[in-house]
Every structure is written in structure tokens, then in C-alpha cells.
């Protein structure tokens, strides 16, 4: 008979009580707060002992068999975190994973007595919460099959409750009915340089005159008709105003802005940022706004400088805000870039009064937000990830959040210089 997969919380409490895994320990006498080592797998000083808790859970859950399967620390850690994500009786109390000397996370049980509750082997209900497996009438029969024994620490008054293995039954797990999560983080493929696609929309005095969606692995350039087409970055030519505007003076001014673009405004992705650089004479200001309007009631986020690159979007805070959004923050992260060409940013005027406004939407970021909205706050919902030239991947909301958390950790690790 196949051994049933253990539930994460009773298993974790037992590991904490045993105290045999390096760095895994209770932090208070009431045993409600505990620490888990959280070192990045690519650190130069990383050793297998640093990932003992993740490997132990991988073995206990049947995801890894020593000598048979290839060790995969990142997958072990992601599966462990995904299992904890859907436990409402737990919360992350402190994230010290960036500590250069002792990277770890602190968790705590948020409900008084929850630690003892999960130790009794409570099973999850359909909402991811905990419920007792037996009614009060059946409690005497339940305790007949239990052996009460002291904890390893003889000075403690707590008692460990160990069930007779023959009495254990496998608990239903919604993840058993879903597609298994891919070993590699699929979000890295979605955000790979060759996957960056941009939806570009241009407005002349508030009127939409151009929209195009295009793959730009090396970046793009917003240009007029006089640009050098042999330069790097894919040229996106803004249309002549003649066929769109009736006011002769406005057409003339728009034409001057387009001519002043020269070799264009370049936008490209490198590392975890989007970068912009102005190659012509026309000044340009940028801001992160909503997809339907540029939030012109405030000042710009910055100016695009001539012949000097500058970051206009950072993926790290976007992903962090996306995780917070999934956890119920209510704040939807922004990803739409607006550029005002040839004039000051419309801080005190309606944006539709500006001669040339260009909106750029990275479609991969839009898709990430849509996936978060589809999953919502429910760990039981699934989201489909669509990547070019591949089959859609179905993920639970918890798996999706775990992959996002992986991205944040990787970006933090790269930002600290690979300690």
C-alpha cells in the first residue's frame, strides 16, 4: 500500500520539535514562532545542509528520492513555500532572506492554540482552512488509537501525540487533480528577452492615430520618417499627421515634434529593468500610468535623457506588488509607460491637449496581472500561462505566487552582487 503524503503543518511541527535540521528551530517558549533557513541556492557559501528542511519535505512528500532523482534545490524550496502559502493559520512574520550572514524567514501561527491544533492532524477543508476530522462524539474512539509520549525536551510540559500508522488515511489534496507544476520556473521564460512584446499606441492631441503590437527582442525606437533605419532597436514609425488632423497649425507643430525625434526614442529590456534613451532633439518625459490614461494630474516620473540611458521600469517592485495584490492589498501594480514628446508633461492640463503622446504596454506584464486577477485570493483557482511556441501551463494560485516569489528572490540575489 502506498504511503500517504503527509500534511505539511503536522510534519513541520514534528521537525521543529525534533530539532535535528540545521537552523530550523522554535523561537519562543510557547512554540508559536519559528525560523527556517532561506539561503539562495547560487550563493558561493551554499551547502546542502542549508537546504535540509526543503529536501526533507521533498522526500516526505514523495517528490524526491535520493539516489534516483536529481537534486533540485530551487524546486524543493518552491514546493515547500507553495505548501505554506495556502495555510491560513500561518503568516510570514519576518523576511530576513537577504541577511548576508544568516538568511532566514520567521513564521508564526496567527491563531492561539493553532500549533497544537495542527499537531492533532487537522485536515484542510475546501477553502484551505483547517477543520477537525472527527465530531465530538467520536473523540473517545479517536484517542483510543493515540499514544501519548513526552517530547524530546523532558523539561517541557507539552506532549507529542503520535497516531498509530495503521489508522492513518490519505487526506484529499486538490493539487492531486491538477497538472503538476513544471520543474523550471515558467515565468522566467515568459519574461525572457526574446519574449518581450510591446503594444504601442500613439495619440496626436488626444486622437489615436496608431496602434501596433510587435515582438522586439532587442528593443524598439519611436521614430518619425527621417530616422536612420540601420541603427539598433526595431524602428516604430509614428504616422504623418496629415491624414489625421484638420487644424493646419496643429499639424505643423506635430510635424516639428516628429522631425525633432531624429533617430528616435529607444526603449529596451536589460536585466530586471526597462531602459530608455533619447537620440534626437525633441525632449521627452515619461510616467507609469493606467492603461486608459497617463495620470496627468501629477508630475512625470522622469525625463528621457539624450544619449544617456535611464531606467523607466523596474520589474522587482512590480512583481512584489503583484504578490501583495494576490494577498489582498487591493493595489493593482502599474505597467503602462506613457511618453510625452516635444513638450513638458501635462501636469496641469488634460493630456489630450499634448501634441504627441505615446503609450507602451509590455504585454507580458499585462498577462502576469491578468493571471493574478484570475487566481484572486483563492488557492483553489487555477490560472493558465501562455508562452509563445508552447502549450498553456495550468498553475494553482499558490503555485503561481510561489513562482513570483522565486523571481523576487532571484532579483534580490542578483542585486546584492551574488554574496
Curated annotation (Swiss-Prot):
Entry-annotated residues carrying Phosphoserine: 14, 97, 123, 135, 378-379, 388, 390
Any one GO CC term of the record: cytosol
Start-end of DNA-binding region: 5-111
PROSITE patterns per UniProt: IRF_1, IRF_2
Location (main, coarse): cytoplasm
GO biological process: cellular response to lipopolysaccharide; cellular response to virus; cytoplasmic pattern recognition receptor signaling pathway; defense response to virus; lipopolysaccharide-mediated signaling pathway; positive regulation of DNA-templated transcription; positive regulation of interferon-alpha production; positive regulation of interferon-beta production
Localisation per UniProt entry: Cytoplasm; Nucleus; Mitochondrion
Intrachain disulfide bonds: none
Stored Gene3D superfamilies: 2.60.200.10, Winged helix-like DNA-binding domain superfamily/Winged helix DNA-binding domain (1.10.10.10)
Effect the entry attributes to changing residue 152 to A: Does not affect acetylation by KAT8
Entries under CDD domains matching the protein: IRF
Mutagenesis / variant outcome for changing residue 388 to A: Decreased acetylation by KAT8
Region (Interaction with HERC5): 194-353
PTM sites of type N6-acetyllysine: 359
GO MF terms held by the record: DNA-binding transcription activator activity, RNA polymerase II-specific; DNA-binding transcription factor activity, RNA polymerase II-specific; identical protein binding; promoter-specific chromatin binding; protein domain specific binding; protein homodimerization activity; RNA polymerase II cis-regulatory region sequence-specific DNA binding
UniProt xrefs under SUPFAM superfamilies: SMAD/FHA domain, Winged helix' DNA-binding domain
Cross-link (Glycyl lysine isopeptide (Lys-Gly) (interchain with G-Cter in ISG15)): 188, 353, 359
Residue segments, region Mediates interaction with ZDHHC11: 140-419
Diphosphoserine PTM positions: 379
Modification note: Constitutively phosphorylated on many Ser/Thr residues. Activated following phosphorylation by TBK1 and IKBKE. Innate adapter proteins, such as MAVS, STING1 or TICAM1, are first activated by viral RNA, cytosolic DNA, and bacterial lipopolysaccharide (LPS), respectively, leading to activation of the kinases TBK1 and IKBKE. These kinases then phosphorylate the adapter proteins on the pLxIS motif, leading to recruitment of IRF3, thereby licensing IRF3 for phosphorylation by TBK1. Pyrophosphorylated by UAP1 following phosphorylation at Ser-379 by TBK1. Pyrophosphorylation promotes subsequent phosphorylation at Ser-388, leading to homodimerization of IRF3.
Modified residues (Phosphothreonine): 3, 75, 230, 237, 246, 396
Effect seen on changing residue 70 to A: Does not affect acetylation by KAT8
Keyword hit for Phosphoprotein: yes
Assembly and oligomerization: Monomer. Homodimer; phosphorylation-induced. Interacts (when phosphorylated) with CREBBP. Interacts with MAVS (via phosphorylated pLxIS motif). Interacts with TICAM1 (via phosphorylated pLxIS motif). Interacts with STING1 (via phosphorylated pLxIS motif). Interacts with IKBKE and TBK1. Interacts with TICAM2. Interacts with RBCK1. Interacts with HERC5. Interacts with DDX3X; the interaction allows the phosphorylation and activation of IRF3 by IKBKE. Interacts with TRIM21 and ULK1, in the presence of TRIM21; this interaction leads to IRF3 degradation by autophagy.
Known function: Key transcriptional regulator of type I interferon (IFN)-dependent immune responses which plays a critical role in the innate immune response against DNA and RNA viruses. Regulates the transcription of type I IFN genes (IFN-alpha and IFN-beta) and IFN-stimulated genes (ISG) by binding to an interferon-stimulated response element (ISRE) in their promoters. Acts as a more potent activator of the IFN-beta (IFNB) gene than the IFN-alpha (IFNA) gene and plays a critical role in both the early and late phases of the IFNA/B gene induction.
Name by which UniProt lists this protein: Interferon regulatory factor 3
Record organism: Mus musculus
Annotated gene: Irf3
Amino acid at each position: 500500500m502506498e504511503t500517504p503524503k503527509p500534511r505539511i503543518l503536522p510534519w513541520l511541527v514534528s521537525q521543529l520539535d525534533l530539532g535535528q535540521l540545521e537552523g530550523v528551530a522554535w523561537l519562543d517558549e510557547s512554540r508559536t514562532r519559528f525560523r527556517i533557513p532561506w539561503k539562495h541556492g547560487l550563493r558561493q557559501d551554499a551547502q546542502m545542509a542549508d537546504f535540509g528542511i526543503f529536501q526533507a519535505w521533498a522526500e516526505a512528500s514523495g517528490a524526491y528520492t535520493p539516489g534516483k532523482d536529481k537534486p533540485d534545490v530551487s524546486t524543493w524550496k518552491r514546493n515547500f513555500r507553495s505548501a505554506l502559502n495556502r495555510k491560513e493559520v500561518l503568516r510570514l512574520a519576518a523576511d530576513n532572506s537577504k541577511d548576508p550572514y544568516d538568511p532566514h524567514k520567521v513564521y508564526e501561527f496567527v491563531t492561539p492554540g493553532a500549533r497544537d491544533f495542527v499537531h492533532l492532524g487537522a485536515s484542510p477543508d475546501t477553502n484551505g482552512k483547517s477543520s477537525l476530522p472527527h465530531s465530538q462524539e467520536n473523540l473517545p474512539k479517536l484517542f483510543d488509537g493515540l499514544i501519548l509520549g513526552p517530547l524530546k525536551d523532558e523539561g517541557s510540559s507539552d506532549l507529542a501525540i503520535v497516531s498509530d500508522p495503521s489508522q492513518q488515511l490519505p487526506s484529499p489534496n486538490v493539487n492531486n487533480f491538477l497538472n503538476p507544476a513544471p520543474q523550471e520556473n515558467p515565468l522566467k521564460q515568459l519574461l525572457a528577452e526574446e519574449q518581450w512584446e510591446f503594444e504601442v499606441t500613439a495619440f496626436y492631441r488626444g486622437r489615436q492615430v496608431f496602434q501596433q503590437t510587435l515582438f522586439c527582442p532587442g528593443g524598439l525606437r519611436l521614430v518619425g520618417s527621417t530616422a536612420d533605419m540601420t541603427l539598433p532597436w526595431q524602428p516604430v514609425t509614428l504616422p504623418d499627421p496629415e491624414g489625421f488632423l484638420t487644424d493646419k497649425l496643429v499639424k505643423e507643430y506635430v510635424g516639428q515634434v516628429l522631425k525633432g525625434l531624429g533617430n528616435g526614442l529607444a526603449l529596451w529590456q536589460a536585466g530586471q529593468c526597462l531602459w530608455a534613451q533619447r537620440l534626437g532633439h525633441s525632449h521627452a518625459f515619461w510616467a507609469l500610468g493606467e492603461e486608459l490614461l497617463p495620470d496627468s494630474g501629477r508630475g512625470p516620473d522622469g525625463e528621457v535623457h539624450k544619449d544617456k540611458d535611464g531606467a523607466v521600469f523596474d520589474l522587482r517592485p512590480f512583481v512584489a506588488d503583484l504578490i501583495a495584490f494576490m494577498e489582498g492589498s487591493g493595489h493593482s501594480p502599474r505597467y503602462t509607460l506613457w511618453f510625452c514628446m516635444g513638450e513638458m508633461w501635462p501636469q496641469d492640463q488634460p493630456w489630450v491637449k499634448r501634441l504627441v503622446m505615446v503609450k507602451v504596454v509590455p504585454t507580458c506584464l499585462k498577462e502576469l496581472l491578468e493571471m493574478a486577477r484570475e487566481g484572486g485570493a483563492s488557492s483553489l483557482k487555477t490560472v493558465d500561462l501562455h508562452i509563445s511556441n508552447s502549450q498553456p501551463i495550468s498553475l494553482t494560485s499558490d503555485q503561481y505566487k510561489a513562482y513570483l516569489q522565486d523571481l523576487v528572490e532571484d532579483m534580490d540575489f542578483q542585486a546584492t552582487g551574488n554574496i
